[in-house]
A protein has these predicted regions:
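Short amphipathic alpha-helical segments that mediate assembly, nucleic-acid/protein binding
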Residues: 2-3, 135
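Subset-of-secretome marker
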Residues: 23-150
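Sec-dependent N-terminal signal peptides of Gram-positive bacterial secreted proteins and lipoproteins
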Residues: 3-22
Length: 150
């Protein structure tokens, strides 16, 4: 009976430790960009585990002054995303537009992308020895570019 209690305590302790050290968390960052032709609201949900970023979900809403401006913006965005997906993989995106409003959704899974190809597009990326972003470094980068992160 005493051995069973000891084994139960050990198993529970290991489960708790495993949960604490493998806990998946996220932060959100938002940025609003405005000029005379359009307003862009960007929302980033950054998932990390053990301080390493493994996925980012991006949702952007664009409201343009005219349909032509929106079409140009959305075409540029879609071309960029298409190139990223072809070059680095695991870059899932969706682009929608209606009149003068557009929406994009992107999911970047850093565990599945070709990081060498990614670095060609993002040579300034500050990655750790595992070729991953550290959550604090990525948060700092977004904040330096005007985003508010929580």
């Amino acid at each position: 009976m005493k051995n069973a209690l000891i084994i139960t305590i050990i198993v529970l302790s290991l489960a708790i430790i495993s949960y604490i050290f493998n806990k998946k968390e996220y932060i959100t960052c938002t940025k609003k960009t405005m000029n005379e032709d359009y307003t862009l609201l960007s929302n980033y949900k950054i998932y990390y585990q053990n301080e390493e970023v493994y996925k980012i979900e991006i949702k952007e809403n664009v409201e343009a002054k005219t349909t032509n401006i929106l079409n140009q913006i959305m075409q540029n965005i879609e071309n960029s995303y298409k190139n990223y997906k072809e070059e680095i993989g695991s870059y899932d995106y969706e682009v929608k537009k209606e009149k003068t409003k557009g929406e994009t959704k992107v999911i970047i899974n850093y565990d599945e992308i070709d990081m060498e190809a990614y670095l060609k597009y993002n040579p300034e990326a500050n990655l750790n020895e595992n070729k991953k972003y550290n959550i604090e470094d990525l948060k700092k980068m977004y904040e330096e570019r005007g985003a508010i992160c929580k």
